Amino acid sequence: MGNLKCELTYLPEVSYALYQNYVPIVRELLLTNEGNTALENLELSLSIDSFGRFPYQQKIALLGAHETLHFTDDLHTLSIDPTAILQRTERVDTVLRLTLQDATGTTLHSELFPIALLPFDYALQIDTLPEMLAAFVTPNYPAIAPILQRASHTLFQWTNNGSFDGYQSEDPNRVRKMMAAVYYAIVQEQLIYSALPPSYEKCGQRIRMCDTLFTQRMANCIEIKSSLCRLS
């Protein structure tokens, strides 16, 4: 229907870290009736083709002539299937589908917006959402345990106490020694500096998870820093 106009503010690329931290895919939706006739009993729907988990649906009792409705609340209900990202090793392009129907199920307006799903190890929007890097601090990976055991051995040699008791000792110097032991354990891994893992994206980067990092023994600056955080 040519009298309907939709404006969407959304993320053109979606990553697992964004999903896990409840960053909404769609931030704002404007629906305008540019015609001279009011529309009643409408249903607005947003979904992601092939990889959507929960669509966004909204009942609209009345959309007046030349009226614009502004949607921001509950848009976070639109989400992807997380397994769709966990199974990806490369970017997958799909579409965000918007549909507006009347009470009879007749489609009054339909529009497609391009969107992409990125691999789970991809860090997006480092410049605008740097806090998302914290999602890659994964202290429960099994690959962490051998590094901590080595650090504990070093800590015991230095202090006769190999326990990682954090601030329970109430001794700032002990905390420093714990961090030094962790750092020394990572140094012993003899990591080779390696540039960013291969990717075709224009922004963001892949981040090697700790199992890959300590197996391949290659890492860049962000990966080494995230490893220190994982072990802290």
Name what the model sees in each region.
Residues 45-92, 100-104:
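Intrinsically disordered, low-complexity Pro/Gly/Ser/Thr-rich segments with frequent PxxP/GP/PP motifs
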Residues 36-41, 108:
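Short acidic/proline- and small/hydrophobic-mixed sequence motifs that coincide with surface turns
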Residues 21-28, 92-94:
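Short, solvent-exposed loop/turn segments enriched in Ser/Thr/Gly
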Residues 29-36:
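Asparagine-centered strand-capping/turn motif at beta-strand->loop junctions
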Residues 136-216:
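Secondary-structure boundary elements
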Residues 1-24, 49-52:
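Low-complexity, acidic Ser/Thr/Pro/Gly-rich terminal tails and inter-domain linkers that flank the onset
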